[in-house]
Amino acid sequence: MSELQTTPSPEIRLKENISKKPETMTKIFWEKFSKNKLAILGAVILFIIIMSAVFAPLIAPYPQEQQSLLDKYKAPGLEHLMGTDKFGRDIFSRILYGARVSLLVGFASVVGSILIGTVLGALAGYFRGIVDAVIMRVVDIVLSIPDIFLLITLVTIFKPGVDKLILIFCLTGWTTTARLVRGEFLSLRSREYVLAAKTIGTKTHKIIFSHILPNALGPIIVSATLKVGSVILAESALSYLGFGIQPPIASWGNMLQDAQNFTVMIQAWWYPLFPGLFILMTVLCFNFVGDGLRDALDPKNIK
């Protein structure tokens, strides 16, 4: 007697395909991202830096403000891994605490600017007309002003401080995100699923945030990752010029400002070297991760 062969019904096969699709998309993303060795290296280094900043009070061998004039300009060694500064403060400890400030400014500023830019860009791209014209003219005006001039002007008005810097970067950093999101919405608003949602009477805010926005998240995530590195670099530049984070709060930028004396750079080379290396390494790692995410989230790579 021949064995009965059962085949799954079309409905069962459809359910199986639907349930497997998200897993397949995730797998494709990870395969693409993991092939970028620089992105993986950048992610690992960033994880170490972030964890070191979070647990700085447990890792730092000395309090960040502990001074010892007898240990002034002490070279790197077992007692002070990265040497000391002009007040005898341990540079390694100050770099760990400075990472907390620089990363806080970077992440908080990007979250705020991404939220503002996404909302305004979505409104401009979806409604077009007068809404689009007004928002884009504001974007053009802000982008027409040199970044460093605009930042220094706002810092002078609001006065330096961590919270003030975050606010300033939010107010100046949303424009590129708004332009990016607007472009995505202009290309997605005429898709079939959006037209179908309009036809059945779906509310406008639900179409924007539930139907269109999820399909524009890829470029937004990539932009946010790259912007963190840019904000950290800008904060360091402002602090180096004396317009950013002010002592006694440690940041990588004001540590470089303390070491800008030519004699210090020659005789105590470790003083400017290590803060500069951490700024460079962190910005590069964010760029590496951003490039990896851009390649992995490219729709051409997800079939």
From Swiss-Prot:
InterPro entries: BP-dependent_transpt_permease, MetI-like, MetI-like_sf, Oligopeptide_permease_AppC, OppC_N. GO terms for molecular function: transmembrane transporter activity. The chain crosses the membrane at residues 39-59, 103-123, 138-158, 165-183, 212-232, 269-289. It is a multi-pass membrane protein. One of its GO terms (cellular component) is plasma membrane. One of its GO terms (biological process) is peptide transport. The keyword Acetylation does not apply. It is found in: Cell membrane. It comes from the Bacteria. PANTHER family: D,D-DIPEPTIDE TRANSPORT SYSTEM PERMEASE PROTEIN DDPC-RELATED, OLIGOPEPTIDE TRANSPORT SYSTEM PERMEASE PROTEIN APPC. This protein is a component of an oligopeptide permease, a binding protein-dependent transport system. This APP system can completely substitute for the OPP system in both sporulation and genetic competence, though, unlike OPP, is incapable of transporting tripeptides. Probably responsible for the translocation of the substrate across the membrane. This is Oligopeptide transport system permease protein AppC. The gene is appC.
